[in-house]
Amino acid sequence: MSLRLTSAFVLFVISACIGAVPPAAAQSEPPVHAPVQANPDIRLLGGEWIYVEDRTEGQPMERLGPPMASKFSMRVEDALDAVILNGHGSGHRDVRIKLDGTRTEIAGENSRVVRYRGSWKNGVFEYEVDFGREPGKPGIGILRRRFLVTPEGLIVRVAVDPPAEGGEVESVGLYRHAEDIPLATPAKGTIADVAWIAGAWVGTRPSGSSIEERWSPPLGGAMLAVSRTVNTSGRMVAFEYLRIVEREGGLVYAAQPGGAAKTEFVLTEFGPTESGGKRAIFDNPRHDYPKRIVYELSADGQLTATTGFLKGGTPRRYEFTREDR
C-alpha cells in the first residue's frame, strides 16, 4: 500500500464541487451554525487554506468532504485590485483574477478557452470559471465560488451549472490557515501497543496493482517500514518510507511518500475492536489529506489500513495478508 499524501487531493477537486457534503460534526441532522459576519479587509484572503469541515446541509456522512481542493492558496496583489489563485482545482496555476469584472482567458483542452471573472463586494470575493462547454454536452459549464472571511475561518461556497444529477445546488466548507487548526489530542502509548503491525504485508488493489508494507519489529522505541505499489505491467508506481516512534509518552506516525519531506500523525486512539481485533488511529487535522490513518488487525489476522478525513467521506481502504501465509 502507499498512503500517498497528496497536497491537492485531486479526488475531491471535481467530485466535491459537483455536489458534496454536510458538516463534519453532523451525524443524522446538520448542526445549526450562527450567522457569519464578513471581514471587509480583502488582504485577509491571502495565504494557504486547509479544509476543516463541511458545512453543506442535508447530505449523508459518506458524502462529507471539501467543496473544492482540500488545500489551496490565494495572494492579494499590493494594489488590492486582483487575486492570484493556486491549487483551486481547475488545473491552472497563478491565475490572476481582476476584481473589476475583467475576464482572464486561459487556453484549455481541445483548443477551448477557459474564462475567469471575479469581483470583491461587501466583504465577499467571488469568481466564476466558464469552461466553454458546448450546449448539450456532458460536464461542468460554469463553476462559481464565493469566499467569505469570518472570525472562525474562511467560508467557501461552490456551485456548478448545470448541477450534477442528484447533487446539491451549492456546497459549503470551512477552511483555516494551518496554524489556526487545533492539534489532535495524543493518547498515551508505547511502541509495544502497536507491535501487531510488524511483519511483511501484501495485497492487491481493485486495479490489479500489488501493494506491500514491510514493518520491522519494535526495537528502540520505534518501528520502521517501506511501502511499495507495483502496477499490472510490473512497474513500481509509488513507494513510501514509514515509521512509528515513541515521543513524549505517545506515538507518532511519520510518512514520506516518494521519499519526500515527512508528514506526522499522532496516535489518538488504540485498543481492541468489537469483533476481537485491534485498532490504532493516527490523526493530523492540519494536513490536507489524509487527516486520519487507521490500522486494524482482524481476529483472523488480516491487516487493513484506511486513509481519509476525520469525519465522513469515503476513506481509501487497503487490505493485506501476511506474505508467509
Summary of predicted features, one role per range:
Residues 1-4:
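N-terminal secretory signal peptides that target proteins for export/translocation
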Residues 7-20:
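Bacterial N-terminal signal peptides
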Residues 17-29:
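Signal peptide processing junction and immediate N-terminal pro/mature segment
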Residues 28-325:
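Hydrophobic small-molecule pocket/channel-lining residues, especially in calycin-type beta-barrels
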